[in-house]
């Protein structure tokens, strides 16, 4: 959606693919299942990415700058690799890899295959879990099944395990989502499984 909006507004933008590295062992081989957008403005390439959930970029990154770059939330940096760029976030004093970005533009069919894989493969975390993320002002909320993580700028990270009522309340208050009656059995099931 972001790519389409940027193109419609007249920006020179193209999709790039990336190998997610977030919370994975350093040498684990993973498919390129993430899409980010390269935007060219005044002969400079910028990375725009609003779809990486729990640590999504809250400002574009200048792909030519290898050092730390400030975003609305945590700093990020671009680390040159052989044929790729690694995007990292600074959390609790440590640089953590988000993903390795391939700089070759991607075709729609490749992106469709990646989307199909992460949405339907039985081993995909998105197929097995309830995952919701919202970033606003100076707070991030991430819900994975019944675990709510809240990160506020300059504050300790807060973790909470939610019961069925807490899930419903969090989805409404923290994520701004409407709840339908047929969701409640899922909330009960999730709270029992945890």
Segments predicted by a language model, with ranges:
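Hydrophobic/aromatic-rich core segments of domains that either
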Residues: 4-77
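N-terminal accessory/pre-domain segments preceding catalytic cores
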Residues: 7-9, 81-194
